Amino acid sequence: MLYFRNDYQVSCIPEINEAFSSLNNQIYEPYGTDSITEHAKEILKSKMKDHDVDIQFVYGGTIANITMIRSLLASYEGIIACKTGHIVMHETGSIEATGHKIIVVDDCDGKVTADAVQKVVNQHQISFDHMVFPKAVYISNATELGTIYSEDELHALHDKCKELGLYLILDGERLGAALMSGVGYTLNDIAACCDMFTIGGTKNGALFGTAIVITNPDLRDKFRYVMKQSGALMAKSWLIALQFIALFENDAFYKNAKKANEFALQIQNSLHNLGYPLLVKGYTNQVFPALTLKQYDFLKEYVSFEIWDKRDDYIIVRFVTSFSTTQEEVNELSEYLKQAAKLG
């Protein structure tokens, strides 16, 4: 069986295993006050040298989103997100469970636009205090569809948020894939476009872990209180920080993502050449082909993948590559795709 189901099905890169083996029962201060965490923060800050940022480490993406959004919103405030957003579709109502409404807008290939944000604010102005007050915007990069924001799109969205008095947060669980897709911007540029954003490790070679980067100084003071209240403050926080050192010290973070993107592009090209329709044209490590029922029934016997959407006469599935994907696996998948294509 080939595994293209997700990008977190293998434990971690060798550098992280080596880092853990070097701990040797040493003693570290708890809750992110240790020397390893400070070192990890300094490494990440060096990637955003034009900005004064605060960094906190949590164990995963959903808890990062919960913590960031809870820290931003009053009880009567909500957050804008597109209909395909991770907090809308794949976090089991975790934001709503905190008492905050997600104001859902249509997406443009998985992306929120400045115009969509303006429309929400215009609609709110009709009823004022009879509606949830829009206070923040949530985006992800790469998006749930594997698409990416251009730097111009990020700046346009950030400028619109500033104009309207909204916070902008970016979910970066697949930020490595976005940065290595050829967009031409860096972590330093991302820091200029958001009030908060995350750098995901779990989907790019770490065992687990997410870095929350707070760029807006007004949002830092009580953030760790919200972390603790949300169950996000780990006693052994250095276990996350150590992984980010291993990811960034010698650029494994970028190498992992580049490799995954390149393999996904090979798969996408094979699909295109074989005549499979694609949901979107992707540039990252996720590929979304449409399969007939016969093609789906054949492929599922040999390949592990996710069903993304079911239509009347075809099924949209998702193939995901990762740091652990091999050329042999990609070649074998291409052979199965050739066989399935003949089934029509």
Map each language-model feature to its residues.
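Conserved C-terminal alpha-helix-loop-beta "cap" of PLP-dependent enzymes
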Residues: 74-76, 265-267, 271-342
